Curated annotation (Swiss-Prot):
Cytoplasmic side, ranges: 1-63, 133-141, 190-201, 254-291, 348-362, 406-416, 470-512
Entry protein name: Monocarboxylate transporter 10
Gene Ontology CC terms: basolateral plasma membrane; cell junction; intracellular membrane-bounded organelle
Role, per record: Sodium- and proton-independent thyroid hormones and aromatic acids transporter. Mediates both uptake and efflux of 3,5,3'-triiodothyronine (T3) and 3,5,3',5'-tetraiodothyronine (T4) with high affinity, suggesting a role in the homeostasis of thyroid hormone levels. Plays an important role in homeostasis of aromatic amino acids.
Highest taxon above the source species: Eukaryota
Pfam families from the UniProt entry: MFS_1 (PF07690)
Phosphoserine carried by residues: S260, S495, S498, S500, S501
Disruption phenotype: Deficient mice grow and reproduce normally, show no gross phenotype and no obvious neurological defect. Deficient mice, however, display increased plasma, muscle and kidney aromatic amino acids (AAA) concentration under both normal and high protein diet, although this concentration remains normal in the liver, but it does not alter thyroid hormones homeostasis.
Length: 512
């Protein structure tokens, strides 16, 4: 066996200098190890080295190469999933015209639940998706999710009433989108580290681009080929998403690959399920910084989506003579894409958890812009508010995944993002209906928009605690490490003193 590089040179020379001879007798045993002991020690060294190389340390992100193709695939995923969801307003009008019954006065309420259920299910399923991502990897999870989404969207084009859409569009299609979307956030952290903020900005900008273009495309398709054929055409987006999922080549082994010793198997191989205690990694919440982050983000989102849902109706009531009300959402989509690229790049220059300050800044401005909506007496002022709101919306979204990687690391980022998105589904579902209820009671949206600006401020204040908690933890670790180092130095010094004292006594005795 080739000797280890860490083995002292003097020891090697001593072993080489000993000539072979007869086996020692029992009366004079050699102090050194025998041949069997040497082989055991060598085997232990090899085992330790193999254990270290078996995946205990995550691989270094390549910062490019195949990762650029992964980035484009993730960009298509974000664009197709949230572009379709954000353009539901166009489908909403077509569904009303297609399924409307003369004796049904609640048709708008029923139709609205289709889109609301779909958006909520995407985020609600994310904690479950994170488990599948850890168990089977990003590639398998994303591909299967896109296939399920394709089936749900295609089956939605064959219904004859609004109720089956709750299952086909609101649950099956949304769950498939969730399984395809969440791995697209996780896989980027495996391929990028230094450029992760910029890459996430580019990927999340895909939803802005699709949000700008899809409403125009859907409007033309519905007017020419009607609703059902439009849904079938949208299935093309899901099929491309299915193909894009195959680009998520894994760098970090999944849980199943670790349990099987890292051996590769077929794509749809049968695997033994993990125990429940290993499925959901609740130990993440023992990390105080992540627990605060997972509480602060949903708290800020109680008012986050109120302008996106009720802005059109507010403009209709406040500015009756304005025809192009859709330009407000186009402004939000354009500046949101700019914000994702801009702040994603800025995040690359902020070390560690200081990236959280960008989210704090974005929530403060989003809350302020929400409160300014009722104060706008001119449509031009409202356009300016929407431009600013979209810019900081892009800031908040683009750095979500980089912060998760900073707080828990790449190995646990999947479930960290999944838990967060699951928590986000609650305020996203509850906030807009509360604003609608206030409008029904008061006859105006003014109070609703004022109140919608409060939760982003509160959530931003909570997020400010994260850098403080992190720095306090680092100081404690440094202090403990310094104490251990001092104790070790004192032990070494005392051992040297005791050794020198023994030598002095031995020499004195021999002289006497």
């Amino acid at each position: 066996m080739v000797p280890s590089q860490e083995e002292p040179a003097a020891e090697r020379e001593t072993n080489e200098a000993q000539p072979p001879g007869p086996a020692p007798s029992d009366d004079a045993p050699l102090p050194g190890p025998g041949p069997s002991d040497v082989s055991d020690v060598a085997a232990e060294k090899v085992e330790v080295e193999l254990t270290r190389s078996a995946g205990s340390e995550p691989p270094v992100p390549p910062e490019g190469g195949w990762g650029w193709l992964v980035m484009l695939a993730a960009m298509w995923c974000n664009g197709s999933v949230f572009g379709i969801q954000n353009a539901y307003g166009v489908l909403f009008v077509s569904m009303l015209d297609t399924f409307k019954a003369k004796d049904d006065d609640n048709m708008a309420f029923k139709t609205a639940w289709v889109g609301s259920l779909s958006m909520g299910m995407i985020f609600f399923c994310c904690p479950i998706v994170s488990v599948f991502t850890d168990m089977f990897g990003c590639r398998r999870t994303a591909v299967v999710g896109a296939a399920v989404g394709f089936i749900g969207l295609m089956s939605s084009s064959f219904v004859s009433s609004i109720e089956p859409l709750y299952l086909t569009y609101g649950i099956i299609f949304a769950c498939g989108c969730s399984f395809a979307y969440q791995p697209s956030l996780v896989i980027l952290g495996h391929y990028f580290k230094k450029r992760l903020g910029l890459v996430n900005g580019i990927v999340t900008a895909g939803s802005s681009v699709f949000t700008i273009l899809l409403p125009l495309l859907l409007g033309n398709l519905i007017s020419s080929v009607k609703l059902f054929n439009t849904l079938r055409i949208l299935c093309i987006f899901m099929f491309v998403l299915f193909l894009a999922g195959f680009t998520y080549r894994p760098l970090v082994p999944s849980t199943k690959e670790k349990e099987s010793g890292g051996s590769r198997s077929s794509f749809f191989s049968r695997r033994k399920l993990s125990p429940p205690k290993k499925v959901f990694n609740f130990a993440l919440f023992k990390e105080t910084t992540y627990a605060v982050w997972a509480a602060g983000i949903p708290l800020a989102l109680f008012g986050y989506f109120v302008p996106y849902v009720h802005l059109m109706n507010h403009v209709k009531e406040r500015f009756q003579d304005v025809n192009n009300k859709e330009v407000l959402f186009m402004c939000i989509g354009i500046t949101s894409g700019v914000g994702r690229l801009l702040f994603g790049r800025i995040a690359d220059y902020l070390p560690g958890v200081k990236k959280v300050y960008l989210q704090v800044l974005s929530f403060f401005f989003i809350g302020l812009m929400s409160m300014m909506i009722p104060l706008c007496s001119a449509f031009g002022a409202l356009i300016a508010v929407c431009l600013a709101m979209g810019l900081f919306d892009g800031c908040f979204i683009s750095i979500m995944a980089p912060i998760a990687f900073e707080l828990v690391g790449p190995q646990d980022a999947s479930q960290a993002i999944g838990f967060l998105l699951g928590f986000m589904s609650i305020p996203m579902t509850v906030g807009p209906p509360i604003a609608g209820l206030l409008h029904d009671k008061l006859g105006t949206y003014d109070v609703a928009f004022y109140l919608a600006g409060i939760p982003p401020f509160v959530g931003g204040v909570v997020l400010c605690l994260i850098p403080w908690i992190h720095s306090k933890k680092q100081r404690k670790i440094s202090k403990n490490a310094g104490g251990e180092k001092m104790e070790k130095m004192l032990e070494n010094q005392s051992s040297l003193l005791s050794g020198s004292s023994g030598i002095f006594k031995k020499d004195s005795a021999s002289i006497i």
